[in-house]
Amino acid sequence: MSEQSREQRRYEPVHAVSRQGGQPDGRGWVEEVPEEETRSYYGRSVLKEPTWTWEIPCYFFAGGLAGASSGLALTARLAGNDKLARRALLAALGGAVVSPALLISDLGRPDRFYNMLRVFKPTSPMSVGTWILSSFGAVTGVAVVHDLFGVFPRLGRLSEAISAVLGPPLATYTAVLIADTSVPIWHEARRELPLVFAASSAASAGAAAAILTPVVDAGPARRLAIGGALLELGAAELMKRRLGKFLAEPYESGKPKRYERLARALSGLGAAVTAFAARKSRAAAVAGGALILAGAASERWSIFEAGFPSSTDPKYTVMPQRERLNARDGGARRG
């Protein structure tokens, strides 16, 4: 074979690329590679499916209710509404007792929960959250003992104030926790999830207090329940819009869709009942509060369930990365 023939064969792929629409970049011809279909790696997902079980969304709900209830308790106390303050404080303690039990059940052994307390890591949402939960439970317990039995007056009042300070972080840190994972539908909603969780927590705290408190004293609780429920609905819709149609797809089918629809219906109906009937009827207050509580729980379950299809289908991981790379490359060319 002649030298010229070898050179022709050597550069034939380059000529073929140029004939197919390749572009020169100063060093030769660069092939325009067609977009590849998103695939898994040898049949495996890019990400691992979350290993959390049913205890975790229940913990999201219980912890949020506890955290928001402590703030409601202190607000009612400062306003002189001791009946509402006591019942909100009891709701906070109930959530603080149930939450560690749910976490321990998910972890499998009590010593795993204890081991998370041995080292404090400010950069770990789980470590910070465990310490917040433990501290919250301790001070809320002291505050309840003081409120019920009148002992330790100074310590009791201080504990109630500290409980109210720790309440908002307890109600929202779980949103930071799941947003800190690599699950696309959680991570990409990291700006909106804390608002959704805060609103849901406020709604559930107000609803629980409205159920437990006599109608005449429950006005602030009803207003918190209604406002929280409406804000929750709005924040959840905002979260989906900012995710975009593609990333929010898991909310449009299966369990996430069913729970989300249920959350909308229950929260909306509960807010209406609480607003228009609960001011005069104890039965209506209980019914409206129960509907709002169920709606808040359903919202947490919807978010939890959406994480599974979002993590197992590789397109939700690969496509956003590809879009970011394309945007970066486009910016570099313009610069």
Residues covered by each model-derived region:
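Short amphipathic, positively biased membrane-proximal segments
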Residues: M1-G335
